[in-house]
Amino acid sequence: MKISVLGSGSTGNSVLVSTENTTVLVDAGLSAKQILLRLAEIGINYDDLDGVLITHEHSDHAGGLRVLKRTLECPVFISEKTKHAYLAPKNSKNGEKESKLRNDAIGDCSVKIESDREFRIGDIDFEPFSVPHDAADNFGFVARNRGYRIATLMDFGHFTPFINEKLKGCDAIVVESNHSIDMLRACPVYSWELKQRISSETGHLSNEDLSVWLSAEYDGSARDIVLSHLSQKANDPFLAKITAESALNARGPLFRSDTRITLSDKGKPTEWISF
């Protein structure tokens, strides 16, 4: 099993999970054009996709889906609550028209999943789990194949004991490191209301939040940790990485020495992480 973050940031997120027999696109927050280009860049033909999995309806995770479905023939795996929210966009200027276009795009090709019940796509078992975020039915998941476990959780405001338990024993973790607390407070382009939303317990995880988890709760099993959903206005990639690495180094004797911290990028895919 292998994974690549096709692109990740405040403006768009897409991840690819693949085995020898199955390839799944997780979220379509990039433009359809960029998703297709980045699939090609890492050697994947879009015709080989077995499904598109949508974790929640926000535009930075589902904004490219409608146009992407003009090209793709594979089904869309989506929960009932998320589908309902996706088909009733709140912030669209042409809400009724956009809703119809979205329904036309995925109405007949969607597969209902539940955010608290395991499901399978091809030979990949998905173990979803709810995470605290201000969306209709947002979830993270652990993808399993041949004994390997890869977790992905991008949009969530804080760690919970339930999340901690789900992440134990994972070989790789794609996790949010959205903002620096100080940079968010000082950000001149974000309104006070937006800053409050981002920093809330149902908003987005900070570098500092992740550092505390790495120091106190992380079990040290993952060979790779990929930092995702970095804010372009309230974070710095070097700061995010050094904050995470410092937390690991502080407990170095307790952890495997080869744990790698990788930065995702909004503009290009990460290299494959393979098991």
What are these regions (language model features)?
Residues 26-29, 49-57, 77-80, 151-154, ...:
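Active-site neighborhood of phospho(di)ester-bond hydrolases with catalytic His/Asp-centered motifs
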Residues 161-264:
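Cap/insert and terminal regions of metallo-dependent hydrolase folds
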Residues 80-140, 144-147:
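Metallo-beta-lactamase
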Residues 63-72, 87-95, 236-242:
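Metal-dependent catalytic neighborhoods of phosphoester/phosphodiester hydrolases
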Residues 1-42, 139-155, 172:
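Conserved beta-strand hairpin/beta-sheet module of binuclear metal-dependent hydrolase folds
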Residues 5-14, 57-65, 83, 126-129:
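Structured catalytic core of nucleotide-sugar glycosyltransferases
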Residues 43-45, 94-105, 218-220, 249-256:
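Short helix-capping segments at alpha-helix termini
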Residues 33-81:
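Active-site metal-binding motif and surrounding structural segment of the metallo-beta-lactamase
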